[in-house]
Structure formats: C-alpha cells, structure tokens
Amino acid sequence: MRALLSVSDKEGIVEFAKGLEELDWQILSTGGTYKLLKAEGVKATEVSEFTASPEMFEGRVKTLHPKVHGGILHKRDDATHVAQAKEHGIEGIDLVCVNLYPFKETTIRTDDFAEIIENIDIGGPAMVRSAAKNFKDVLIVTSVLDYDEILKRLKEKSDDYEFRRSLMIKAFEHTAAYDSMIANYMNDRFNGGFGDARFIVGSKVFDTRYGENPHQKGALYEFDYFFTNNFRALKGEASFNNMTDINGALMLATSFDDAPAVAIIKHANPCGFAVKDTLLESYVAALKCDPISAYGGVVAINGTLDEELAKKINEIYVEVIIAANVDDAALKVFESKKRIKIFTQDNKFLVRANDKFDFKHIDGGFVFQERDFVKDEELENMKQMSKKFATGSELKDAQIAWKVAALTKSNCVVYVKDGAMVAIGMGMTSRVDAARAAVAKAKELKIDLSGCVLASEAFFPFRDSIDIASKVGVKCVIEPGGSIRDDEVIEAADEHGMSLYFTGVRHFLH
C-alpha cells in the first residue's frame, strides 16, 4: 500500500507517517513535508523520483502528473482501468493526506498580492478531489484530527465504505471552503465584496437539540474558529435560541470596550442594560428596567462573574449567563439549579468577531450587506440642533442610549438615566407607538423617567414622540435626523426645553 503525504500544516504528520510505516505502507511526499519526514527518520520517497519528473516553476508543478493522478483515480475493480495502469506504468496510491497552502493566513499577514497569489494551492486541491472521487479505493485525509482514527481503523481493517465516504465528504467540504475563501477574498479586494457570487462557508461547532422550534433541526456553524476559541460551556448545552440571544447580548455588552457593562436579553432584544461602576451595580440597575421579561433571559457580563454577583443573579431564574470569565465560587452558586446554562469566553472582557459583512435569508436567496457598526465618531460629531445644551451626564447617557437603540429591532426608542436603560419600546410598526409602549411599561413598573435621555435609531417623522417624552420629563434626545419635518421636531424640543442632537447616521435593524 502506498500513501502520499503533502501538507502545509505539519502538526502530527511525522507520527502519522511512522504509524503508516509500521503497517508496511510506502510513503511518498513533496517539498517541505518530504524534508521533515526524512529528517525524522521516515523512509519517504520524493514524488519527483516516483514520477521521474522534477518539480517545476518554483514548485508550482509538483504533483500534477499522470503517475500521481492515475495512481489515485484508477478503479481497482475495473479490469480496463487496471490494464491501462499497467500499460502506462502507473502504480496505485491508496491514501492521500493533504492540507492546503495557508491562503487565509497569508492574507492576514501581508497585502502583497504576488505573495498571496503564490499561496493559492493548485496541486493540493486537485489531489484531494481525485482521491475523494475515488474514495472507495483511496483514503482521503484532510484533517489532522483524523490521523489517529485512520491509523486505528487501518490496524483493525475497519476502514469500511461508510468511513471512507465520511472522509470523502470532509474532503469536498475542505476544497469547497478553500475555493470559496479565495473567491470571496478576490471580490473583497477588487469588487468591494459584492461580486457576481458570494460564498458563505462555516464550520460546524455543534448540533443543537433542535432549531428555533422542536420540529426543526439546528446547528451552530462558525467563521474562523471564533466559537472554538471564544466559547466554552461550563454548565448545560446551548440551544439554537440561546445562541441567537447570546449573539444579541454580546453585541450590546461589548459596545463599551472594557466598561463593566451588563446586558439582559430576551428573544434577541434588550430588556435590561447598564454601565455602572461595578458589574454588580450594573446588573442590579439593568434588572430594574424590566424584571418580568428578564425571567428566563440571557445575561451577558463584560468581566468576571464572581460569587457575589452570582448570588444576586440566582435570586431570579435566568436561562443563560455568558461571561468573559467565571470564578469557581460563582459556578458553585448555581450547582443546584438544573436548568441554568453558563458559558465563558475565558477572556478578561467579552469579545465579538466583528464580521465585516452581514446577510439574511429570504425565500429563494439571501440579501447581503456591509455590517452596520455604531462608530464612536457618530457621537463625537453629532450636531446640536436645539437651543439648549446637554449636561455632561446627559451626554454620557446619550452615548449609551444611542448604542442600545442602534442594536435593537426597529422601530425603537430607548430611555436611559444614570447609565442604565430604564425603558424601551422596540420592534413596533410606528415610532410613536414605540415611544408610548416604553412609557406605559415604565409607568406599570413605577419607574421615574424624569431626567432621561431618549434615543431613536431612525429619525422621528413627527413631533409626537418628542411631545410624549416631554410629559415624562425627558431632558435630552438623540436621533439621526433626516425627516422632512426635522424643523417641527427641533421646534418641539425647544418648546419643551430639551436638548436635541442629530448624528446623521441611521441604524435600522430588521
């Protein structure tokens, strides 16, 4: 039996080659892999010797040869194929182990297009596809994680059809992801990310028990190992809905750098948020906004969950806690709670991936766009439209209100006071209804809105929301502006003695 090993990621390849040698396999190899194997005492044969054809064009042509692809592709149970192989001196290659040139890593490391082009693998994908096509006769290995299992099955002679087929699927996933990555990069570089095709490729992290509802299948996929590197379960398993809520929580809790922010999320929308001096103070303040909706919600903690904070959270039922880090003592607080799920990123503060693009499935396709980021410049460059100036504390609250509004489903209005969200109206079909809903909820919970800052993620089309805000004592309003009736809104703010600021940037979220 003969194996061809040619890898860019050389982790575990020496041990894998030695394991094959112990099973009396002959080893073929190329370039850097060959040199490493020889240095480690593996009796490898260089592919150029096997093909009697040298590497050419600075290594661009190594394995693109009939003796390589014929050795991989000919069917062992087809008499015509076997005869042709014998006629042309083609010997079988029964295992192909390949991982591809590090294209992604190269694009991160350099902007030199010539170097990037040289890190587009040609021979590797060709071998992978050849071996995958002939998977009944050839084992195709594209993942370091499969080395031990393959050696085990070869020893036990249990490399059956189903196992080979599973490796074939992985191989085509591997080459498809690789080519998609290259195409996306070229479109990002030369077409602003909006070429004639866009590929969305993720790697499975885990299956969820079900999807959004019990009759739907579901799973979590990741880009660039984000969850592999930044998500660890300490208690319980994340559901599909948990992950969408965690996403909303992370977007909000990471919007204030290393500030001790706490976000409480329900159905991907905030029902509590605060930035106080400590995480405990932030949680207590966030919970006051809507303690009823917080029941069964997701709590995101931009810092370490300690025992004191854990005891406070444990006073109500929350389904999920996601924290930058979790103390052992804090984890013990929840030992008796069977339903709570606790996850950590094992970081000092929470992090998010900051993907550059965003997409939404629509029936028959998807819409694709640049990611909407709330930039600090929006607040730094906002224009005062009213006669009255905001105070320093009001401007701090305006920053919080603006970011919360921008990350909440439209139509949305947010009321913030002393660093905490105290009322919110969201996902409404009219902006004035969102304003009314927020005020009504605050009254129901006996929350005093006087002195609040009001934010809206899009312009107020009429002055009615400003009039409503004035009745509950709002002192400052921040919105994008851009309505044909902006003058009426400005006039209303001046009438009520409010400060009014326009950011000039809309943040619809659907």
UniProtKB/Swiss-Prot annotation:
Gene this protein is translated from: purH
Gene Ontology cellular component terms for the protein in this record: cytosol
The protein's name: Bifunctional purine biosynthesis protein PurH
Domain of life: Bacteria
GO biological process: 'de novo' IMP biosynthetic process
GO molecular function: IMP cyclohydrolase activity; phosphoribosylaminoimidazolecarboxamide formyltransferase activity
Pathway(s) annotated for this protein in UniProt: Purine metabolism; IMP biosynthesis via de novo pathway; 5-formamido-1-(5-phospho-D-ribosyl)imidazole-4-carboxamide from 5-amino-1-(5-phospho-D-ribosyl)imidazole-4-carboxamide (10-formyl THF route): step 1/1; Purine metabolism; IMP biosynthesis via de novo pathway; IMP from 5-formamido-1-(5-phospho-D-ribosyl)imidazole-4-carboxamide: step 1/1
Entries under PANTHER family matching the protein: BIFUNCTIONAL PURINE BIOSYNTHESIS PROTEIN ATIC (PTHR11692:SF0), BIFUNCTIONAL PURINE BIOSYNTHESIS PROTEIN PURH (PTHR11692)
Keywords: Hydrolase, Multifunctional enzyme, Purine biosynthesis, Transferase
Lineage: Bacteria, Pseudomonadati, Campylobacterota, Epsilonproteobacteria, Campylobacterales
